[in-house]
């Protein structure tokens, strides 16, 4: 399954909005080289050059060569993306992931309901004449 150039562009700009283009370019470069990449002109410590290549040349995707260079970086990009941004890429939009997200939402709702119930018991015990201010409230 191929990830569209526009989707990679979107997540990289979103990550750069949070961390900065230089940070993202450096992280991609380090991961690309760690994974054995060496074909692209990315050099550790050359933050400005790496940022220029990734964000201001290749990510534009105006030519086939630019898009191909970004495709070569995809394994490194996937490795550095935080979970909040990975979902924007089609390869992560699976039935299993949707089920896990639904379960996560259900768990969050259950936790909120639990906390609301504890708060209601506490309020009733302390503010409705159900006890003096020295009484403790125990919830099991």
Swiss-Prot record:
Asked if the Swiss-Prot or TrEMBL record annotates the protein with the keyword Transcription regulation, the reply is yes
Keyword annotations for this protein? Transcription, Transcription regulation
Task: Tell me what turns on expression of this protein.
Answer: Not expressed under normal physiological conditions. Expression is repressed by the transcriptional repressor RacR.
- An annotated GO BP: FtsZ-dependent cytokinesis
In terms of InterPro entries, this protein maps to: YdaT_toxin, YdaT_toxin_sf
Q: Does the keyword Transcription regulation apply?
A: yes
Q: What happens when the gene is disrupted?
A: The toxic effects of racR silencing can be observed in the ydaT deletion mutant (where YdaS levels are elevated), but the ydaS-ydaT double deletion mutant shows complete attenuation of the toxic effects of racR silencing.
Q: Its biological function? A: Transcriptional regulator that causes a severe detrimental growth effect and reduces cell viability. When expressed, it alters expression of a variety of bacterial regulons normally controlled by the transcriptional regulatory protein RcsA, resulting in deficient lipopolysaccharide biosynthesis and cell division. YdaT has no effect on Rac prophage excision. Overexpression of ydaST reduces growth and leads to loss of cell viability. May contribute to toxicity and morphological defects.
Q: What else is known?
A: Encoded in the Rac prophage region.
Q: What is this protein called?
A: Transcriptional regulator YdaT
Species whose genome carries this gene: Escherichia coli (strain K12)
Q: Which gene encodes it?
A: ydaT
């Amino acid at each position: 399954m191929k990830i569209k150039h526009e989707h990679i562009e979107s997540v990289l700009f979103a990550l750069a909005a949070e961390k900065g283009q230089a940070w993202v370019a450096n992280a991609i470069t380090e991961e690309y080289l760690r994974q054995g990449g060496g074909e692209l002109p990315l050099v550790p410590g050359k933050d400005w050059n790496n940022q220029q290549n990734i964000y201001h040349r290749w990510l534009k995707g105006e030519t086939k060569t630019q898009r191909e260079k970004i495709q070569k970086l995809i394994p490194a990009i996937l490795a550095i993306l935080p979970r909040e941004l990975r979902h924007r890429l089609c390869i992560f939009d699976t039935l299993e992931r949707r089920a896990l997200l639904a379960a996560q939402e259900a768990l969050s709702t259950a936790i909120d309901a639990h906390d609301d119930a504890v708060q209601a018991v506490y309020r009733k015990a302390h503010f409705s004449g159900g006890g003096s201010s020295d009484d403790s409230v125990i919830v099991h």
